[in-house]
């Protein structure tokens, strides 16, 4: 089994994964998972984009490594506990990945800084982007090793001390520069792929399609309840309650807290109803399942299709920013809640449209409105400025009462 017994060697592996990601046409980020002896357990790169299409907005390196860890454990593979595992990433974790790392209890060693979306975007190890209750854990487990040199890529060590199995605890300046430049070379072009969908006025109602249409059949395979509920756009009502309640029961059966999320389209049609898979992975929340399922539904319909067929898919299954995610439970200030907020940002990847300011809705609050607004305002610039993440409670009192009962 390959080993990386100094930080530089581990970051070099992550940088090679980042180069592979760039070659694939996705965000140039990579990561590697090590045990407490420095043995390489797994190495992956970002997989948000495949074949020029959005494949999975949650497929960042760190998130993939964590789900891989839990999947291997579920298969019976003997792996060390998370606190003995170290994830080495070529780029500062985003909010989704930081939440996933903290939820699992892993250690992390970070190469390049990310001033826009990184959890340490301020660069001082204060982690003010995190909810206050998570900051101390981050300071104890997130390491930003020294980069020796005189260029803008040099830095002093910040955060936790890298795990003791690392003999060398610094990053070479050229490797740090490579990690930064590979990401910078891909960020704009990849983000642009999230804007390939038509505007709201060009969308078509999938509820008008015949049952045998390939889009309807694919929807029904993914979610048998698709197109069986409809409300005024952006105004979920009490009719949605049974769908959320059913998903919440299934979530509890899977070891979750009663998590449930539905995706409504721009016309108010129910497209997906999802629960978490926490018995399989500590980070497979209902929202992570929902946003991934929708992206992969669209990807499978568009992969290998003609441009005209791809356009049809995008017209009937628009970008989520034109629809509404409805959570049974609002975001909390725990690691999973922060991960969900981050994953929402990774799904949007751009500003919410002016016609749909209430894209992110929840039925029952986990935090009071002021505290939730404060949590969102503390997030890195991508989330609070560019995307404008702002969850809000549904307006329908009967829906709230039904889920509270």
Region locations from a protein language model:
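Glycine/small-residue-rich phosphate/adenosyl-binding loop
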Residues: 40-43, 64-81
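Short hydrophobic alpha-helix segments
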Residues: 42-45, 273-275
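Active-site-proximal gating segment of KS-fold condensing enzymes and close homologs
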Residues: 52-64
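Immediate flanking context of iron-sulfur cluster ligation sites
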Residues: 79-91, 108
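Short cysteine clusters
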Residues: 94-97
């Amino acid at each position: 089994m390959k080993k990386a017994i100094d930080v530089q060697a581990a970051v070099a592996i992550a940088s090679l994964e980042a180069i592979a990601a760039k070659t694939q046409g996705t965000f140039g980020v990579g990561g590697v998972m090590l045990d407490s002896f420095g043995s390489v357990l797994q190495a992956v790169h970002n997989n948000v984009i495949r074949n020029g299409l959005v494949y999975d907005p949650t497929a960042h390196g760190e998130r993939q490594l964590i789900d891989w860890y839990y999947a291997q454990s579920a298969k019976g593979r003997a792996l060390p506990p998370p606190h003995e595992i170290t994830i080495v990433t070529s780029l500062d974790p985003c909010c989704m990945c930081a939440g996933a790392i903290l939820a699992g209890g892993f250690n992390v060693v970070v190469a390049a800084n990310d001033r826009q979306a990184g959890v340490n975007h301020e660069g001082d190890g204060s982690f003010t982007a995190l909810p206050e209750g998570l900051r101390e854990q981050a300071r104890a487990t997130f390491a930003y090793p020294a980069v020796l040199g005189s260029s803008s890529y040099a830095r002093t060590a910040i955060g936790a001390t890298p795990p003791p199995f690392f003999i060398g605890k610094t990053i070479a300046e050229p490797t740090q520069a490579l990690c930064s430049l590979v990401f910078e070379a891909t960020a704009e072009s990849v983000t642009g792929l999230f804007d390939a969908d038509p505007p709201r006025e060009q969308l078509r109602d999938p509820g008008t399609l015949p049952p045998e249409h390939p889009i309807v059949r694919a929807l029904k395979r993914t979610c048998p309840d698709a197109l069986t509920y409809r409300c005024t756009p952006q105004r979920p009502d009490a009719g949605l309650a049974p769908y959320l309640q059913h998903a919440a029961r299934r979530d509890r059966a899977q070891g979750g807290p009663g998590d449930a999320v539905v995706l409504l389209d721009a016309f108010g049609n129910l497209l997906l109803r999802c629960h978490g898979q926490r018995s399989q992975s500590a980070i497979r929340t209902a929202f992570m399942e929902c946003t991934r399922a929708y992206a992969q539904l669209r990807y499978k319909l568009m992969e290998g299709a003609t441009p005209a067929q791809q356009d049809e898919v995008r017209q009937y299954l628009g970008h989520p920013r034109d629809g509404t995610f409805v959570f049974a439970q609002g975001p909390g200030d725990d690691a999973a809640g922060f991960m969900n907020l981050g994953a929402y940002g990774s799904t949007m990847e751009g500003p919410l449209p002016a016609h749909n300011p209430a894209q992110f809705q929840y039925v029952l609050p986990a935090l009071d409105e002021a505290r939730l607004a404060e949590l969102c305002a503390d997030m890195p610039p991508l989330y609070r400025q560019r995307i404008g993440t702002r969850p809000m409670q549904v307006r329908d009192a009967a829906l709230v009462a039904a889920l509270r009962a």
